[in-house]
């Protein structure tokens, strides 16, 4: 029987990675069965125009199967969860009708805090390990646009997972190998997730705090020192958790965060500057809590988190006054 996958959403992340799986099936390269759980308006767009992806690895447009929350049945082997952290609760409610007792969930959210919540809801046996790297957006016309060359998905078994999860991930890996996606099927997936978490928390904390790209920050008198300091605080948390970054990864991260003229920023900065919601609590706030568990000296993470909280407090105050 082909693997039946439910992809939550068809936006920048779910639309890209789910779309690549659907494209492989559409071309006859894979027998994987992909459905997209979407809202009515997005379903109408996809029915009328198909799923359209603009990508440096090859743009495409294909018809896709969509399903509404009210139409879900418990018939899926795997749910690919790619929501923003602040939408986690509503996403859990959305996928529930599609979950069998043995359905696995593969979250590719940023950070780590979501694992505890998903484990409580579905059981740690069924919540697999994963993360992804992609910069993209969904245009007003419904086009999934990949903005850079980077498009990687990483997944693997967590220590708590069942053997059934292994078979599901094997089939998923086989399907992704028929696509242009950079696949990492890892036997140390928590290490990979932690290494991304360290990079992202440093990048988001500093670019939001300084309101600038990496190159803007390191061009200042104290920018490189501050960037290195926040990276060190995040690495302290990772080391305390037993997942210190591997030397080559740490070196690559440090270089990425110290490159002059770099326009690299976190998507959190774009969300912040556009007045949108951010994953501040899930990324910076959670990293601060984990770093403090390792030791009390976390001044830069504390400032970055206070900055994001102050922004939320101001928005709340201004909205309540109107």
Q: Which residues does each PLM region occupy?
A:
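NAD(P)+-binding Rossmann beta1-loop-alpha1 motif at the extreme N-terminus of oxidoreductases
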Residues: 1-59
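NAD(P)-dependent Rossmann-like dehydrogenase/reductase catalytic/cofactor-binding core
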Residues: 2, 224, 228-322
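Nucleotide donor/acceptor-binding cores
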Residues: 2-4, 77, 103, 151
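A structural signal for isolated positions on well-ordered beta-strands in alpha/beta enzyme cores
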Residues: 6, 33-35, 106, 128, ...
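Short, well-ordered alpha-helices that flank and scaffold nucleotide-derived cofactor binding pockets
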Residues: 19, 23, 27, 93-97, ...
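Short, charged/polar "capping" segments at the starts of alpha-helices
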Residues: 42-47, 115-116, 239
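Rossmann-like NAD(P)(H) cofactor-binding subdomain of soluble oxidoreductases
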Residues: 58-144
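Internal alpha-helical scaffold of NAD(P)-dependent oxidoreductase catalytic cores
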Residues: 67, 97-98, 120-130, 141-251
């Amino acid at each position: 029987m082909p693997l039946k996958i439910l992809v939550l959403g068809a936006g920048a992340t779910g639309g890209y990675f789910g779309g690549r799986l659907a494209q492989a099936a559409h071309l006859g390269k894979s027998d994987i069965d992909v459905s997209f759980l979407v809202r009515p308006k997005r379903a109408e767009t996809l029915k009328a125009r198909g799923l359209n992806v603009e990508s440096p690895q090859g743009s495409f447009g294909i018809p896709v199967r969509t399903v509404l929350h009210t139409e879900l049945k418990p018939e899926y082997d795997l749910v690919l969860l790619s929501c923003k952290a602040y939408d986690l609760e509503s996403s859990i409610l959305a996928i529930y009708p599609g979950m069998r007792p043995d359905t696995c969930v593969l979250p590719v959210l940023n950070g780590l805090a979501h694992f505890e919540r998903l484990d409580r809801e579905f059981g740690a046996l069924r919540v697999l390990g994963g993360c992804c790297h992609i910069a993209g957006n969904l245009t007003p016309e419904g086009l999934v646009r990949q903005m850079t060359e980077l498009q990687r998905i990483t997944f693997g078994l967590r220590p708590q997972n069942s053997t059934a999860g292994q078979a599901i991930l094997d089939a998923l890996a086989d399907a992704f190998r028929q696509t242009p996606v950079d696949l990492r099927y890892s036997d140390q997936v928590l290490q990979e997730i932690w290494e991304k978490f360290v990079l992202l928390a440093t990048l988001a904390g500093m670019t939001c705090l300084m309101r600038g790209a990496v190159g803007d920050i390191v061009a200042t008198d104290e920018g490189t020192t501050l960037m290195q300091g926040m990276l060190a605080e995040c690495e302290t948390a990772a080391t305390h958790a037993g997942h210190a970054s591997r030397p080559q990864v740490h070196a690559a991260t440090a270089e990425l965060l110290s490159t002059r003229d770099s326009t690299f920023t976190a998507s959190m900065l774009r969300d912040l500057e556009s007045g949108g919601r951010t994953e501040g609590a899930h990324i910076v706030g959670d990293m601060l809590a984990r770093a403090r568990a390792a030791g009390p000296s976390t001044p830069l993470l504390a400032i970055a988190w206070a900055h994001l909280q102050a922004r939320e407090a101001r928005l709340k105050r201004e909205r309540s006054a109107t």
